[in-house]
Curated annotation (Swiss-Prot):
Belongs to the universal ribosomal protein uL5 family. One of its GO terms (molecular function) is tRNA binding. This is one of the proteins that bind and probably mediate the attachment of the 5S RNA into the large ribosomal subunit, where it forms part of the central protuberance. In the 70S ribosome it contacts protein S13 of the 30S subunit (bridge B1b), connecting the 2 subunits; this bridge is implicated in subunit movement. Contacts the P site tRNA; the 5S rRNA and some of its associated proteins might help stabilize positioning of ribosome-bound tRNAs. GO terms for cellular component: ribonucleoprotein complex; ribosome. This is Large ribosomal subunit protein uL5. It holds the Pfam family Ribosomal_L5_C. Part of the 50S ribosomal subunit; part of the 5S rRNA/L5/L18/L25 subcomplex. Contacts the 5S rRNA and the P site tRNA. Forms a bridge to the 30S subunit in the 70S ribosome. It comes from the Bacteria.
């Protein structure tokens, strides 16, 4: 079992149950999935960009990403319907907890000028989204072998009913929010 999953079950869930005054341990908010998305606008001119992004995301997550396609044509962006414009991965269960553990313990401290995560990036339903400017903060990516610096979006979907519950859950996981 993933280290963070054990910590959640044995320490975080009972603590949150008390803190949020819940009657049943199953009511305690939990992380259900983590979605990583890489939007690749530069893929329009060069199809190799998609292959490199797929390889990077596969190294980061240990799971094969899905290529996303444009749903409709947008002349302003020079995009046609059906063209590949990004890659995404959805992590669940043990892989999700292992990724979250690596993100908090290894990757976020490697971000340049890191002052903490924005505590206001919740969506109103307890889900949290954040952006990473460079994929090189992940130790799985070799700096010498990348073709370009690419950012990615990370979304944590939770069972929390409100932003306050979601914030309490992520604080219990020791997310480094700035004040």
């Amino acid at each position: 079992m993933a280290r963070l999953k054990e910590i959640y079950r044995n320490e975080i869930a009972p603590k949150l149950k008390e803190e949020l005054k819940l009657s049943n341990v199953m009511e305690v908010p939990r992380v259900t999935k983590i979605t990583l998305n890489m939007g690749l606008g530069e893929a329009i001119g060069d199809k190799k960009v998609i292959e490199h992004a797929v390889a990077d995301l596969e190294k980061i997550t240990g799971q094969k990403p899905v290529v996303t396609f444009a749903r409709k044509s947008i002349a302003g962006f020079k995009v046609r319907e059906g063209w590949p414009i990004g890659v995404k991965v959805t992590l669940r269960r043990d892989k999700m907890y292992e990724f979250l553990d690596r993100l908090l313990a290894i990757s976020l401290p490697r971000v340049r000028d890191f002052r903490g995560l924005n505590a206001k990036s919740f969506d109103g339903r307890g889900n949290y989204s954040m952006g990473v400017k460079e994929q090189i903060i992940f130790p799985e990516i070799d700096y010498d072998k990348i073709d370009a610096l690419r950012g990615l979006d990370i979304t944590l979907t939770t069972t929390a009913r409100s932003d306050d519950e979601g914030r309490a859950l992520l604080r219990a996981f020791k997310f480094p929010f700035r004040n």
